[in-house]
Amino acid sequence: MTQLSPVAVSMGDPAGIGPEIILKAWQSWRRRNGVPPLIALGDIDAFTATAQALGLPAPCPLPTPTREAAETLDGLPVFDVGVKIAAPVRPGQPDTANAACTKAAIETGVRLALDGQVSALVTAPIAKSVMYEAGFAFPGHTEFLAELCADHPVDGPKGPAMMLAGGGLRVVLVTIHEPLVRALSLITPQRVEATARITDAALRRDFGIARPRLALAGLNPHAGEGGALGDEEIDILDPLAARLRADGIDITDAQPPDTLFHAEARAGYDAAICLYHDQGLIPVKTLDFHGGVNITLGLPIVRTSPDHGTAFNIAGQGVARPDSLLAALEQAVKIAECRA
């Protein structure tokens, strides 16, 4: 098997739980056999302050993002991203002055992944409102990553598409970070088709599933009940599913969302195509609140993230759990191995 280069983890918002869960995840990850080393991207001062406050092992500066360099260090390897924390980090109190360092960590991770210096990028949570105040022009990580990768070819349909996985369930969203009223207007045949094609290709390439089975969630109660409760299934979703099947993609007609996620139904598909954010995230987080993973499909790089936010309310208390970050690391390595 090909020996993978390190897996990079971007710092996230330094006032959130990102530095804490990265430090904790590294302690667990370094004891595992057969996995590439974890390296953190950001300002080492943020990690050092967190380690000192919580009694965790001190991080170490990483001069070069190589496997050999990372494996020689006795603390979390932190690769400098060229932008320092501009304001003192106060757990639970984000500062827009530090958004530039947060952004630089993501950009550095993408650059290293595109150059093949890291096998995958795992992103710790950012605070969208803080980033917006600092001039960040993207709805979230997913869209920003797509922009950074826009000039690079993809093996298959180009994304991005957001997959959430946990508890044996995979869902992929047609609309992502949109208010529900706006999301309804964005559920077009083109978007649904693109999401299904990206998902089918990713399940083959990144998950090793030779013949992926997709389930399509309906929009209306009871999937419209034959038009009695809405026409979107009849007019948009079912005809599109028929066209996709004619092209060799195994996808169901629109299914009632309220019966799509129980154990017996989940056994019949490899991923569910969900039309808006909460339709997909509620079942995943219900099944696996602490271990859910966000996976960006249709990029030239491997990117995953924990399926939770910055958790400012518990930052600095030492109680943040690294479970979802560890699951994101595991998933990133599996995908990187499939692509290797």
Swiss-Prot record:
Q: What Pfam families does this protein's entry cite?
A: PdxA
The processes (GO biological process) annotated in the record are: pyridoxal phosphate biosynthetic process; pyridoxine biosynthetic process
Indicate whether Electron transport appears among the record's keywords: no
This entry's Enzyme Commission designation comes to 1.1.1.262
Where in or outside the cell? Cytoplasm
* Catalyzed reactions per annotation: 4-(phosphooxy)-L-threonine + NAD(+) = 3-amino-2-oxopropyl phosphate + CO2 + NADH
Keyword line = Cobalt, Cytoplasm, Magnesium, Metal-binding, NAD, NADP, Oxidoreductase, Pyridoxine biosynthesis, Zinc
Q: Can you list the disulfide-bonded cysteine pairs?
A: none
Q: Which family does it belong to?
A: Belongs to the PdxA family.
Quaternary structure and partners: Homodimer.
Q: What else is known?
A: The active site is located at the dimer interface.
Q: Name one GO molecular function term.
A: magnesium ion binding
Gene Ontology annotations for the cellular component aspect, listed alphabetically = cytoplasm
This protein is called what? 4-hydroxythreonine-4-phosphate dehydrogenase
Keyword Cell membrane (UniProt):
no
Q: What is the lineage of its organism?
A: Bacteria, Pseudomonadati, Pseudomonadota, Alphaproteobacteria, Maricaulales
Residues binding a divalent metal cation, per UniProt: 177, 222, 277
Q: Which residues are noted in the entry as substrate-binding?
A: 141-142, 285, 294, 303
Copy the pathway line from the protein's UniProt record.
Answer: Cofactor biosynthesis; pyridoxine 5'-phosphate biosynthesis; pyridoxine 5'-phosphate from D-erythrose 4-phosphate: step 4/5
Its biological function?
A: Catalyzes the NAD(P)-dependent oxidation of 4-(phosphooxy)-L-threonine (HTP) into 2-amino-3-oxo-4-(phosphooxy)butyric acid which spontaneously decarboxylates to form 3-amino-2-oxopropyl phosphate (AHAP).
Q: How is the cofactor bound?
A: Binds 1 divalent metal cation per subunit. Can use ions such as Zn(2+), Mg(2+) or Co(2+).
Query: What cofactor does this one take?
Result: Zn(2+); Mg(2+); Co(2+)
